Structure formats: C-alpha cells, structure tokens
From Swiss-Prot:
BP terms from Gene Ontology: G1 to G0 transition; kidney development; lipid metabolic process; lung development; mRNA catabolic process; mRNA destabilization; negative regulation of epithelial cell proliferation; negative regulation of translation
Superkingdom of the organism of origin: Eukaryota
Tissue: Liver and kidney.
Protein name: 2-iminobutanoate/2-iminopropanoate deaminase
Positions of modified residues (N6-succinyllysine): K13, K60, K67
Quaternary state and interactors: Homotrimer. Interacts with YTHDF2.
Family membership: Belongs to the RutC family.
Enzyme Commission code: 3.5.99.10
Originating organism: Rattus norvegicus (Rat)
PANTHER family per UniProt: 2-IMINOBUTANOATE/2-IMINOPROPANOATE DEAMINASE RIDA (PTHR11803), 2-IMINOBUTANOATE_2-IMINOPROPANOATE DEAMINASE (PTHR11803:SF53)
GO CC, one annotated term: cytosol
InterPro entries linked: RidA (IPR006056), RidA_CS (IPR019897), RutC-like_sf (IPR035959), YjgF/YER057c/UK114 (IPR006175)
Lineage: Eukaryota, Metazoa, Chordata, Craniata, Vertebrata
UniProt subcellular location: Cytoplasm; Nucleus; Peroxisome; Mitochondrion
Amino acid sequence: MSSIIRKVISTSKAPAAIGAYSQAVLVDRTIYVSGQIGMDPSSGQLVPGGVAEEAKQALKNLGEILKAAGCDFTNVVKTTVLLADINDFGTVNEIYKTYFQGNLPARAAYQVAALPKGSRIEIEAIAVQGPFTTAGL
C-alpha cells in the first residue's frame, strides 16, 4: 500500500493560528482549511466595520491559504459558516457569492454562542486540488 501525502499549509498572508492547529492541512489532494475569522494578518486584530467587513477579511484570509496550497475558490467543495447572529446570514451571503461563483460548493451555516476574539463570523473550507472536469448526472 502506498503512503498518503500529508503536508501542513502555512502562509504569512493569513493570520497565524491562535491555538494548537494549522492554517490548513493537505492530505493527498484534499485541503482542509481551518476556520478563518475577519482578522487582519498584520495586526492580529479583527477588522473594524462589523460582520460585512469581517466576512470580507475572513474570505480574503481563506483565499490566501488556498493560494498557498496552489488552489483558489474554484477548488472549494464544502464550506461551513459560523455566525454569532444568524440574522447576519443575508449580509454574509451577498459577500460570499462574490467569492464563490459558477459551480458553488456545498455549505452549512450555523449560529453559535461565541467565536474567537469576539468575531461575528468564521468560515472553514474543504478544497480539492484540480484540475476538474464538470460532469452531468
């Protein structure tokens, strides 16, 4: 049996992990990206402006990690969106769909009691290194 590749993915263009975890892990061709909040990687602080600005920054951070793994948003097959207030879903969805277009990933969204650093949003993702072929059912 051949061994499976496992590699930690890291970039200084996204916030460093604030706990005992990696920004992302590549296993074979699948990338598991840890939850990203709206933290500015240079300051280590949440961006000001509320959930909309935090969502943009979280997605920017996600994009930088994907790029470090040789991917982009088109490689994402599943996301999980955690919200401090589910009433922010509409606002977040408008921003989300500017990053994900065409063949959209599967997604789950939940309201949670609290998020790291008082964030209003956290987004995690699973991506697969391409290339892809779109098939009909």
